[in-house]
Amino acid sequence: MFDVSPELAESGYAWEIADAPILHNALNIADIAHALDLLDAGAISRADTQTLLGGLLHLESLPSSEVNYDPSIGEMVTCREQFLVDLVGPVAGSLRAGRTRREAVRTALRLVVRQQVLALTQDSCALIEAICARSIEHSHSLMPDYTYLQPAQASTFGHYLLSFADPVLRDANRLLSEHVHVNSSVSGSGGANGSVIIRDRMRAAHNLGFNKPIEHVRDAMWQTDPFLHVLFSATTLTLGQDRLAEDLEIFASREFGFLSLGNSSVRPSVLMPQKRNPYALSVIRGSTGILIGRLTGQLALSKAPSARSDTYIYAYGELPRSLALAGQVTRLLTSVVRDLVVHEARMKSAIEGSNTEAADAAHLLMRSCGLDYLTAHRVIRAAITHAAEDDRGISADDITWALIDGGFDPEQVEADELDEIFDPMALIQSRKSIGGAAPDTVTAMAGSLLAAALDLRTRLGAEQNNSESAESHLLIRARELVQE
């Protein structure tokens, strides 16, 4: 046996051992499955299998803290082997047959990540549902929409908020589509060219609830792209949430006063009694930055020749921790959205004097006066400048003045049409095309998103049941064998 230098233990094995709490349970499942595969292949006797499974089931009953995961012994697989040797004797060495240590840990990683992908997709569905519920509730709540933090056009808080649901749905669908590749088996890969023992790779895959074996054994052992894609989708999921969090912090400021965060989302200042710091939003923003950094790190590690373990050694813990963080952030934003207090009167008052009707006024001049849009734009710009001299927003009189000043006939503009320009709800009700801000359109969009989230939940449930059933069946079969 090779001696482990203190330097290698501290810098290398300790890094891997730190991931034991994450992978311990999945390693138990992977080892039990491999022991049963060895029995099915006739590689070990029934008696030895019973002894080995007895030790593995004992190991399965223990938390990782009670297993001697010690970097002075080696990495996780070596520590587990030593634990089993001490427990059941030399038969523990049978787990090496037909399988490398990397196959064991990569199987465990896939078992962990496949569940995390499903859980994160479930969390995404809950966020979509929360956004849709609040969007329907506020489909009539007037507010100015902004670009560059400048008032652009009248909208509703419901229409604004709903714009954050579609990106969540897209990322959720990307996560679920990548689950197919994560939920594939590396069992039977052998060292480099296949296993001489585990020949029925399809059976080995199904025993663990994987949908199929990854066909090329070298690709199976060294592929990184499914994990990178999952991490990318988790990062873009939180990036979209960061955008909403950034906006909410601005809208919750005293200067805007559009909304307040619920008490469960804020942290009081220890010095200044009046302050309600939006702590939840800081957590969302900071966590997104962490995930961007972790994604960048994993991409950098993948830039290597093929068949290099460092692409995985530094992913075993980082990837599950990152997916867990993305789930925590998503659940946090869901809570924030549910508890938001919307100040409708303040939002509506922000439209007054903001000139958000200007583009509609220019379009009206196009229709009524036969102007091209550039000329109509200049007329309305002149009206805005004229009104600004008195520090106010434009009115019908300002538009009339600008038309006359520009040499156009204001009588061509119908008075009732001009009055409607200054009714923000009337303008919003006119936006009935697909994706528009009309309340009925917003409600319909939210309904479609809710249906899509429900469909996702149904598909997730089937995948979850398949994985849990396979793992449960493995444990039942192992216990029955031991009890014979």
Language-model features and meaning:
Residues I44, T49, F256-G257, L371, ...:
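Conserved hydrophobic residue
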Residues R110-C125, I136, Q150-A304, S309-V329, ...:
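Charged, flexible cofactor/metal-binding loops and thiol motifs
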